[in-house]
Amino acid sequence: MTVTGIIAEFNPFHNGHKYLLETAEGLKIIAMSGNFMQRGEPALIDKWIRSEMALKNGADIVVELPFFVSVQSADYFAQGAIDILCQLGIQQLAFGTENVIDYQKLIKVYEKKSEQMTAYLSTLEDTLSYPQKTQKMWEIFAGVKFSGQTPNHILGLSYAKASAGKHIQLCPIKRQGAAYHSKDKNHLLASASAIRQHLNDWDFISHSVPNAGLLINNPHMSWDHYFSFLKYQILNHSDLTSIFQVNDELASRIKKAIKVSQNIDHLVDTVATKRYTKSRVRRILTYILVNAKEPTLPKGIHILGFTSKGQAHLKKLKKSRPLITRIGAETWDEMTQKADSIYQLGHQDIPEQSFGRIPIIIKNERLN
């Protein structure tokens, strides 16, 4: 049986994700962000609910990306996720993209020219953000064209880099329905952005989200729930440069900006520059929120849930892979567990996120 990996946030899970799972082949293993997202935002609903939604709509196994993989720039996010999926025996990686191109060809380009491509990045002016530099690199070395906001396409290029030398097949699937950042409600396949924007429109949500009750009946989290905690951390911290990726310039900008900022958007807008993108600033503010220092990654792989078919695959791996199915007195990943505790502070109805939790088990492969 083909084993397909999918890297996801499911923030939240929606019909477009269901389409991706239905289109992908074989047994599907999801490497999913935990309670904080790649662009530096708290998850709308917690990781256990999102895992359950995925397992009820075509996923066979859901594993958790550690905090220092989840909350990273595209290249590190892709590398960390693919490393985990390869340990779980994937043969191919499926992903949605705005532009279906020959990603396999791009893997070969990077395998042959990675040193030259990396060296080229260092020649570009510092006024460009890293994503802008990366786009120029792919344009020069592989002729890739970019148009508009295509975040999934850019992630696909990061997947190509991370797949070099790993002998896995990349399987791009054309994104259906609304564009990634679209707030348009007039789509059966509405975007996650539109769903987050219209959470109070239950009719829209029920048509856009499979098992919509899981979304509707659980706390909806955003930066608004954590901004006061963040403000305390910034004002009370004696040396922000001890936080991961915070340099002197950013520390100064953040310390000044927090005094006049009433919400996260104002703070991000005030701190961001051409060099420091808004996504990067949001990630750094997330690092400050959870007091993240130098990154370390766990050896174990945390299993959030599985179906009967997924369980059979895990049984084949358990003797040769460090699979974690319950976090007890011995920690899995200290940073992720600390981030979970802070996430839980945002709402009294969020249950324990780490200690004692066991995987979600769906006995029937698919419950639509």
UniProtKB/Swiss-Prot annotation:
GO terms for biological process: tRNA modification. ATP binds at residues 7-20, 96, 152, 175. GO terms for cellular component: cytoplasm. GO terms for molecular function: ATP binding; ligase activity, forming carbon-nitrogen bonds; tRNA binding. The keyword Ligase applies. It is an enzyme of class 6 (ligase). Keywords: ATP-binding, Cytoplasm, Ligase, Nucleotide-binding, RNA-binding, tRNA processing, tRNA-binding. Catalyzes the formation of N(4)-acetylcytidine (ac(4)C) at the wobble position of elongator tRNA(Met), using acetate and ATP as substrates. First activates an acetate ion to form acetyladenylate (Ac-AMP) and then transfers the acetyl group to tRNA to form ac(4)C34. NCBIfam families: PRK13670.1. This is tRNA(Met) cytidine acetate ligase. It comes from Streptococcus pyogenes serotype M49 (strain NZ131). The lineage of its organism: Bacteria, Bacillati, Bacillota, Bacilli, Lactobacillales.
